[in-house]
């Protein structure tokens, strides 16, 4: 391709690395959506999955769990762009811990060999990056094959580029999208997963912060022997048409088509775009809604990069590190959050305070003041356990004495703020199972929060609620854990429920 300088003038075995599947009851998953075009899906919805520490570990789900999460795979929950016509449907779902997920359901017998599907899923599930909508689980149940990913609540790049209602994506945000997706591809390549199937604007999703993420679903084929590209042949890498194989260079070609989408705001065939580039008709290529709102120098760089990505010969295309290096210097508004540039509302950092007055514990939870919560739980001691753990005379065995000693050591560590030791001691008490204490679950939940383990904290707070369904503290602790997991709408709901329960107690309920 000619220079664009003056164009504007006219296999992974299960259990490897010690990773073992965990049952759902031991691993509260959460998160946001992952799209799949043909089926690609961007979902609108609440919830989020945040990056980094909020990502749950990869594990196996039962089909019953996913069926419940998606309301029996209701058509109302389909988020694939092609709806029910897509060969592999993507649903949004909600787990028992109130976190949103995206579930990709493959057609029957798409992957007949369960071990092969599981190994592929585990390979992708090891990837963890805030530029990806991460894979958090899978399901192999009979003939059923499903993938479970973080749910991205703010739609796809295709929706924002091709079907926008209030505002199109501004130029700086388009540059950010290209850069972030290049970073995602480079990360996957560095981690030994360089192949991405059918990269297009439907595979780019926006999280709760408005940041672009690359769908993890494209890191696996739609079937064991199936096609890797479901889009129009006009957008397919030429070598794939010849031999049906996806290579890292094929991924670069597809990235070039995404750059064309960002430049033009339309889904135009690469051959047509290249004709315009050769003829130096770049103004016709650019999105008319960006007129007067973009830098011609920056656009020239992107056009040149796109033309390099779309070279007919794979060896002439840039690699992922070249993509990142070219796009990085164009990031001129790095101080402006993505949600501002997208024109979407940012979720609050902490749950909003309900209208009704809050108790000291409620106030501490609304502020996410873990130190104050600790002081209150120490003072409350075990008052709320009355009636939940009565024992018969026969149950007073040596085992019981050992169990209560473990709780006593846990209480001492809790008072002394040795939270890791408190977790160990409370776990000994809980594991015996003869005596169930909501307070122990509540205290261990706070310990997990103070040790930066919000998933485990949420699980314990939910267990406390199971033991004592009307206990405000259980709801308060859930609200803090949910807020730590960036699930702020759910956190606010929990805070309100806790306040309502406290109000009932003050009117004559069980003593606090």
Swiss-Prot record:
Site features described as Major phosphorylation site for BRI1, chain residue numbers: 230
Gene coding for it: BSK1
Keywords on record: ATP-binding, Brassinosteroid signaling pathway, Cell membrane, Coiled coil, Kinase, Lipoprotein, Membrane, Myristate, Nucleotide-binding, Phosphoprotein, Plant defense, Serine/threonine-protein kinase, Transferase
Coiled-coil spans in chain: 483-508
Family matches, as Pfam families: PK_Tyr_Ser-Thr
Name under which the protein is recorded: Serine/threonine-protein kinase BSK1
Claim: Transferase is one of the keywords in the record: yes
Subunit structure, as described in the record: Interacts with BRI1. Interacts with ASK7/BIN2, BSK5, BSK6, BSK8 and BSK11. Interacts with FLS2.
Key word Lipoprotein present: yes
Source organism of the structure: Arabidopsis thaliana (Mouse-ear cress)
């Amino acid at each position: 391709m000619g220079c664009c300088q003056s164009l504007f003038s006219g296999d992974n075995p299960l259990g490897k690395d010690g990773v073992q599947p965990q049952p759902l009851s031991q691993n509260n998953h959460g998160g946001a959506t992952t799209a799949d075009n043909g089926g690609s899906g961007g979902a609108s919805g609440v919830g989020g999955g945040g990056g980094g520490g909020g990502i749950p570990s990869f594990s196996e789900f039962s089909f019953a769990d996913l069926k419940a999460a998606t309301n029996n795979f209701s058509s109302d929950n389909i988020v694939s762009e092609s709806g029910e016509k897509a060969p592999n449907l993507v649903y949004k779902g909600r787990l028992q811990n109130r976190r949103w997920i995206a579930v990709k359901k493959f057609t029957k017998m798409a992957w007949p060999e369960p071990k092969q599907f599981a190994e592929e899923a585990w390979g992708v599930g090891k990837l963890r990056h805030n530029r990806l909508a991460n894979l958090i689980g899978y399901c192999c149940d009979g003939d059923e094959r499903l993938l479970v990913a973080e749910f991205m609540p703010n739609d796809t790049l295709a929706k924002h580029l091709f079907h926008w209602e209030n505002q199109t994506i501004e130029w700086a945000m388009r540059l950010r999208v290209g850069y972030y997706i290049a970073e995602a591809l480079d990360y996957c390549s560095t981690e030994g997963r360089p192949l991405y199937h059918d990269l297009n604007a439907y595979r780019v999703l926006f999280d709760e912060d408005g940041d672009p993420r690359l769908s993890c679903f494209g890191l696996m084929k739609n079937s064991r022997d199936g096609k890797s590209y479901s889009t129009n042949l006009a957008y397919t890498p030429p070598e794939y048409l010849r031999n049906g194989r996806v290579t890292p260079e094929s991924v670069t070609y597809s990235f070039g088509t995404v750059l064309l989408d960002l430049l033009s705001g339309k889904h135009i065939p690469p051959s047509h775009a290249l004709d315009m580039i050769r003829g130096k008709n770049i103004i016709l290529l650019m999105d008319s809604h960006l007129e007067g709102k973009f830098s011609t120098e920056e656009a020239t760089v992107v056009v040149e990069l796109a033309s390099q990505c779309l070279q007919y010969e794979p060896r002439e295309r840039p690699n992922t590190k070249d993509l990142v290096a070219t796009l990085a210097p164009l990031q001129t508004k790095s101080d402006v959050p993505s949600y501002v540039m997208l024109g979407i509302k940012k979720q609050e950092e902490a749950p909003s305070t309900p209208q009704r007055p809050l108790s000291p514990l409620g106030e501490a939870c609304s502020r996410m003041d873990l130190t104050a919560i600790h002081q209150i739980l120490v003072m409350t001691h075990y008052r709320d356990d009355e009636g939940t753990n009565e024992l018969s005379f026969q149950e007073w065995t040596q085992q019981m004495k050992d169990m209560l000693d473990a709780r006593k050591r846990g209480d001492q560590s809790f008072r002394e703020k040795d939270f890791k030791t408190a977790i160990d001691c409370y776990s000994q008490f809980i594991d015996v199972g003869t005596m169930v204490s909501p307070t122990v679950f509540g205290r261990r939940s706070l310990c997990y929060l103070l040790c930066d383990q919000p998933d485990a904290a949420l699980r314990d707070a939910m267990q406390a609620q199971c033991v004592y369904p009307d206990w405000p503290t259980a709801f308060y602790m859930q609200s803090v854990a949910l807020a730590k997991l960036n699930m702020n709408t759910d956190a606010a709901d929990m805070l309100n429920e806790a306040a309502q329960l406290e109000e009932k107690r003050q009117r004559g309920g069980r003593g606090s």
